[in-house]
C-alpha cells in the first residue's frame, strides 16, 4: 500500500505571500518539499485522490500523479473542495461534449453538505457534465484496498476520517476538524496515523500559547497525541 501526501499546508499554503514568519521564509529559500499546498492524499494502489484544494492540479503535477480513477471529499470546507474542477479535464471531453465519469465515494452527509454550500456542485458534475459518478458510502473495497469512511462529527459538522488497509497494513487519515477525536474500533492496530491541526509544542508563530488562542479547542499538541 502506497500513500502520497499531495498537500499538507492547511487552509493557507506555505509560504504564505503575506507572511514573514521563519517557516514561510525558509520555504521561500529552500522551496521543494518545504512549500506546502492544500490538504490532500493520494492512494497510489487504486488511483484515488482524497480532497481537492484550490491548488490540487499543482500538487498532482509536483507529485507525479497522472491518473485519478477514484475521488473522495472529506468535508465541505473550501480548502478541501475549491479545486473540484480538476474532474473536468479528467472526466469530460469538451470537444466531443461527452463525459466519462470518475467514481466519487463520499459519505452521504458530506454530499449533502457540499451541495448545500456549493450550489449543487457535485450534482452538476454528475448530472450535467457526467464527469463523476457519486456513490454515497461509508465503506468501499477496490482491489485489495479496503476503505472505511468514518464520520467524526463534531461541533463543526460532518468530517470524514479514512481508515485505509490492504490486509497487512492500516493507515488512518484524519486531515481536519480532528478535535474532539471520537473513538472508533476501526482505528485500533493502525500502523500509521496521518493527522492535521497539530501544534508541535503548543506555541504559535507569534510566540503566544495555544491554550490562550480562540481556536485552542480545535488543535492538538504532540503531547496530547
Residue spans of the language-model regions?
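Active-site neighborhood of divalent metal-dependent phosphoester bond hydrolases
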Residues: 96-101, 108-132
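Histidine-centered active-site/metal-ligand motif
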Residues: 75-80, 148, 154-155, 195, ...
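Active-site environment of divalent metal-dependent phosphoester hydrolases
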Residues: 77-81, 112-113, 156-157, 179-182, ...
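P-loop/Walker A phosphate-binding loop and immediately adjacent motor/lid segment at beta-alpha junctions
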Residues: 87-104, 108, 206-225
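Core dinuclear metal-dependent hydrolase active-site scaffold
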Residues: 1-63, 131-188
Amino acid at each position: 500500500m502506497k500513500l502520497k501526501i499531495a498537500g499538507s499546508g492547511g487552509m493557507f499554503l506555505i509560504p504564505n505571500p503575506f507572511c514573514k514568519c521563519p517557516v514561510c521564509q525558509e520555504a521561500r529559500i529552500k522551496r521543494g518539499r518545504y512549500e506546502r499546498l492544500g490538504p490532500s492524499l493520494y492512494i497510489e494502489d487504486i488511483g484515488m485522490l482524497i480532497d481537492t484544494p484550490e491548488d490540487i492540479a499543482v500538487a498532482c503535477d509536483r507529485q507525479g500523479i497522472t491518473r485519478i480513477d477514484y475521488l473522495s471529499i472529506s468535508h465541505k470546507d473550501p480548502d478541501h473542495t475549491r479545486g473540484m474542477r480538476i474532474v473536468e479535464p479528467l472526466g469530460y471531453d469538451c470537444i466531443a461534449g461527452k463525459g466519462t465519469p470518475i467514481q466519487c465515494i463520499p459519505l452521504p452527509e458530506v454530499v449533502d453538505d457540499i451541495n448545500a454550500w456549493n450550489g449543487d456542485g457535485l450534482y452538476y458534475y454528475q448530472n450535467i457534465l457526467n464527469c463523476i459518478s457519486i456513490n454515497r458510502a461509508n465503506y468501499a473495497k477496490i482491489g485489495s484496498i479496503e476503505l472505511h469512511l468514518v464520520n467524526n462529527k463534531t461541533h463543526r459538522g460532518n468530517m470524514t476520517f479514512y481508515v485505509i488497509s490492504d490486509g497487512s497494513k492500516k493507515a488512518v487519515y484524519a486531515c481536519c476538524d480532528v478535535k474532539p477525536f471520537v473513538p472508533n474500533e476501526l482505528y485500533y492496530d493502525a500502523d500509521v496515523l496521518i493527522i492535521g491541526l497539530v501544534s508541535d509544542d503548543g506555541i504559535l508563530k507569534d510566540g503566544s500559547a495555544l491554550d490562550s488562542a480562540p481556536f485552542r479547542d480545535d488543535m492538538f499538541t504532540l503531547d496530547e497525541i
